[in-house]
A protein has these predicted regions:
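Sec/Tat signal peptide C-region and signal peptidase I cleavage site
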Residues: 17-21
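Sequence-structural signature of mature extracellular/luminal beta-sheet repeat domains
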Residues: 22-172
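Positively charged n-region of N-terminal signal peptides that target proteins for export
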Residues: 1-4
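Bacterial N-terminal signal peptides
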Residues: 7-16
């Protein structure tokens, strides 16, 4: 759990530092625990953990969209992906984000892990539709399924993604 908190703090600290270029007064919380001096080469030693938004049920899968200069993250129970930018703050990016059916699916219908692939598309782990999907950032209607079966059985609940430098993606 400590590693998760450390990684979350790292990401929030890094992105928070990027945000200060546009806006200089976000509330702060906690502190960054530097377990390795190498971190100083990645994150400025004066960086703080800044709160960019509140009121989310369960935030997951943050990914920085370098080309657009914004952050995407999932709110899994609310079935939505939010977008944060220094210019506009928080706005809704995609709803539904993981369950596109009708009726109630579960308490975890939305997307979870997110990455930007080598083509610049958003790839999402979708609990509700039990798949890994890809879509152009500016054309969500072109979302397509990349994987939904393993050995002939539907995926249970894809959770997170990582991508190798070759572009190969792996999920758990």
């Amino acid at each position: 759990m400590k590693k998760l908190i450390t990684m979350t703090s790292l990401l929030v600290g890094f992105l928070g530092n990027m945000a200060t270029a546009q806006q200089s007064s976000f509330p702060t919380i906690g502190k960054i625990h530097r377990l390795d001096p190498g971190l100083d080469h990645l994150i400025d030693t004066t960086s703080k953990i800044e709160i960019l938004g509140t009121g989310y049920t369960w935030s997951e899968g943050p990914v920085w969209v370098k080309k657009g200069g914004y952050l995407l993250f999932s709110d899994v129970p609310e079935n939505v992906i939010h977008k944060w930018s220094a210019a506009k703050g928080i706005e809704e990016f995609l709803r539904p984000s993981g369950y596109t059916g009708t009726g109630t699916y579960s308490e975890e219908p939305g997307s979870n892990g997110l990455i930007i692939n080598k083509k610049g598309n958003l790839v999402s782990c979708e609990h509700g539709d039990r798949r890994i999907a890809e879509m152009p950032l500016d054309k969500p209607e072109q979302k397509k399924t990349l994987a939904h079966l393993f050995e002939g059985k539907k995926l249970n609940s894809p959770n997170d993604l990582v991508q190798k430098s070759s572009g190969d993606a792996f999920s758990q």
